[in-house]
Every structure is written in C-alpha cells, then in structure tokens.
Swiss-Prot record:
Known function: Catalyzes the dehydration of D-mannonate.
Cofactor(s) needed: Fe(2+); Mn(2+)
Pathway in which the depicted protein is active: Carbohydrate metabolism; pentose and glucuronate interconversion
Similarity-based family: Belongs to the mannonate dehydratase family.
Gene: uxuA1
EC category: lyase
E.C. no: 4.2.1.8
Lineage, uppermost ranks: Bacteria, Bacillati, Bacillota, Bacilli, Bacillales
A GO term for molecular function: manganese ion binding
Pfam families with a match to the protein in the record: UxuA
UniProt-listed GO biological process terms: D-glucuronate catabolic process
Keywords on record: Iron, Lyase, Manganese
UniProt keyword Transcription present: no
Name of this chain's protein: Mannonate dehydratase 1
Length: 365
C-alpha cells in the first residue's frame, strides 16, 4: 500500500509539509484546490503550483480529494451538461500534472454530517461526534450555525458559498428520490469515465457519511450492495471506490473486510479510521486502534494485504490530542499515530508471509 496524507494547502492548514515528511512511510499528499467552487474548471497553473510545493518536500500529488460536483449535476438539471464539461476539463488538467486518482462524492447538500466537532472523551481528547436523535430533532439551519461557530478553518463540504444557498437547495431536493439520485449519478459517470480512462485517472467515489438519509436528503452510497450497483453503472476500471472504513463503519451491519475482498480491483484509494458506535445510533471517532472502536481495523488491513492491495491509503480523521489547535479531525498527532498503527499491522503481515514462505521452502528441501 502507498501511504498518503491529506493536506489543505499553504495558509489553510495547521500542519506543514515539513511536519508531514517526518512521518515514516508517507510518500504523497492528498490535496485539492479548496478555494475553487464546485463546478468550476481547475486552472492548470494552480494545479502545477501545488505540485511544485509538494515535490519540494519529496511528495507526489497523485491523489486529489475532492473535485466537488455541482449540485445541478446531482439534481439532474438542464444546466448539468455545462458543469460536466468543466469537470472533464479539470480531469484533463489534473492528468497533465500526474494525478492518478480523483476522490469525489455524490452526497446532496452536505458532504458529511456531525453534531459536535469537539466531543470530549474520558481521556481528555476531543473528537468528531454524531448524535443520532439530535439530527432527527434539530433544525438543519441551527446545526449549520453551530458548525459555523468554529471559523478557524473552513470545513470541506461546509464552505460558506455553499451554505448560503441552503434554503434553495433543500427546496430543490424536496422531491428528489434515491432512484432519481442514482439516475443522475449514472448520467454523470457515463460522460466522465471515458475522459478519466483516456487520461489514465481512476474516479473513486466516497461513501456517504453517515451512511443513511439525513434531514430528508437521499443517500445512496451506503453499503456493499450500493457499491456493487455503482460499479455496474459503468463497468470500467476507471470507475472505482474510495473505501472509507469510518463512513461505512458507522453502520455496524456493513462488513468492510468482505467489501474489500469483493471489490479489491476497484478500490484505488482507501480511508482507514475507526469509530465507536453506541446502541442508540450515536458514534464518536476514536483512535485507529481496533480495541478503541467498533470497526475491526486489524481485519480490514489484513483484507487489503490478502488481496494484494497496492493502492493509496490515508489515515482518516484523528482525535484532537495534546492540546493541538487544528481543523476538526485533521490534526497532525493522532493521524501520525494512526499511520504508525497501520504500518505496524502491515509490516507484521509482511513478516508472517515471509516466515510462511521460508517454512515452505525448508519443507521442500
């Protein structure tokens, strides 16, 4: 597996490239042009500037997260073709800079949802938290105001230019069903996958976070079954998945290791993180350690190892520890700890494989 690390750019992240390069085994930066609104073409010169910055510190920029999709595409409006053409030009520009994977999502309005950005744990750390009952009772606009109280860093999917149109967007999605959303995703993929394939880029959709409908908005990327359906919409290696163990793991019924075995050749990018799910449906993000959450991180890494996974992996959201001031979920310390935990499992599996091979050779002798 190729270890990468998400970075929000110069002046937009508490973590520096110099710090990231000190984490063992990190070879690339997961990045985006976060100031570019959804639907706009990414200028090649801006892409190349990020490449220059990262390469100065020894990193590649082969994974982009995310090239956000304009809501008109998700809504299936007549204007979607204009935005799809811009998206295709962005794919072409990214290919010119050496990008290999584009992570994106097809979630209406909100890219992800939490009710608390700094929920305190018994050990004194804080983490992203989802209170199931609260989502069913709170006004979505009140939740937006609550999230907006933390202006230190813009949260992906919660950009001010997106949230200022919240009322209009909720009205627009009022009659959009899950099947409508599937149809609109199919339309989008049929038009961009040929471009991605020609450019040598793999599109990797991110599961919905959390993996169920929120505020009456449809969600469709929620399970192994939905991943299978997505891959059949356009059955091509360029149409893939960003398998996120934290997003899918919020539903304990999702068997993530089984998904890895089923779709291994269509997973170019993996997010590995843990969550602790409570009986009432609440969940909190934990350390990456298997014992600390509900998700079997050891089993997931083993599944990647068994399938010969050679794609990109990043530690996903971390806790906020040691008084670090950072973008919620995206500090340095806990994600660095997560990387070392993942490497520990991976190296152990490599050692087991080597020992087994030696044993077989000695038996033949």
């Amino acid at each position: 597996m190729k270890m990468v690390f998400r970075w929000y750019g110069e002046g937009n992240d508490s973590v520096t490239l110099e710090q990231i390069r000190q984490i063992p085994g990190v070879e690339g930066i997961v990045w985006a042009l976060h100031h570019q609104p959804p639907g706009e073409e990414w200028p090649l010169e801006e892409i190349l500037e990020v490449k220059r910055q990262c390469e100065q510190h020894g990193f590649h920029i082969e994974v982009v997260e995310s090239v956000n999709i304009h809501e008109d595409i998700k809504l299936g409006l007549p204007t979607r073709d204009l935005y799809i053409e811009k998206y295709k030009r962005t794919i072409e520009n990214l290919a010119k800079a050496g990008v290999k994977v584009i992570c994106y999502n097809f979630m209406p309005v909100f890219d992800w949802l939490r009710t608390d950005l700094y929920k305190k744990a018994p050990d004194g750390s804080t983490a992203l938290f989802y209170e199931h009952a609260k989502v069913h009772t709170i006004d979505p606009f009140a939740l937006v105001d609550q999230i907006a109280k933390h202006p230190e860093f813009t949260m992906p999917g919660w950009e001010p230019e997106r949230l200022e149109h919240l009322t209009r967007l909720f009205e627009a999605y009022q009659n959009v069903t899950e099947e409508d959303l599937w149809s609109h995703l199919h339309y989008f993929l049929e038009r961009i996958i040929p471009t991605a394939a020609r450019c040598g880029i793999k599109m990797a959709i991110h599961p919905d976070d959390p993996p169920w409908p929120v505020f009456g908005l449809p969600r469709i990327m929620t399970s192994g079954e939905s991943i299978g359906r997505l891959l059949q919409l356009v059955d091509h290696p360029a149409n893939g998945v960003t398998l996120c163990s934290g997003s899918l793991g919020a539903n304990p019924e999702n068997d993530i290791s089984a998904m890895i075995h089923a779709y291994a050749d269509r997973i170019p990018f993996a997010h590995i993180r843990n969550v602790k799910v409570y009986e009432n449906g609440d969940f909190i993000e934990t350390s990456h350690r298997t014992k600390d959450g509900t998700v079997d991180i050891c089993g997931i890494v083993k599944a990647y190892h068994e399938t010969g996974f050679s794609g990109y992996v990043r530690p996903d959201h971390g806790r906020h520890i040691w008084d670090e001031k950072c973008r919620p979920g995206y500090g340095l310390y806990d994600r660095a700890l997560g990387i070392m935990y993942l490497w520990g499992i991976w190296d152990s599996l490599n050692r087991e494989k080597q020992e087994a091979s030696k044993c077989l050779k000695s038996m033949k002798i």
